[in-house]
Amino acid sequence: MKKYENFCNAFNNLKDIYDYEEPFGNVELTGLVGLFEACFEQSWKAMKELLEQSGYDSAQTGSPRHIIKTAYQATMIDDEELWLAALVSRNNVAHAYNKDVALDIIYDTKEKY
């Protein structure tokens, strides 16, 4: 399963986020937010692939939100609300040029996700 391998690699890279503490420079902020984004993207795509392989036809055209909800129903994940919060953070990556948004994403990644 290529998507699962990609997720594992992204997750291992994301662990580096704990090596950094504030104050962050711009490059560090951008890089840490990028690690979160890459890991989240690979996680929902791996879930999608697993759901498809398990016979969930609706997963074939599902959005990340739909995949998360289906994964929860399939007991693939335990905390639907936390995953949906992570999706909101991923959607906020587009606004990570705002330092406060970037810091929120980094904090949530370290403390919640």
Q: Residue locations for each model-derived region?
A:
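Solvent-exposed interaction patches of small proteins and small membrane subunits
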Residues: 1-113
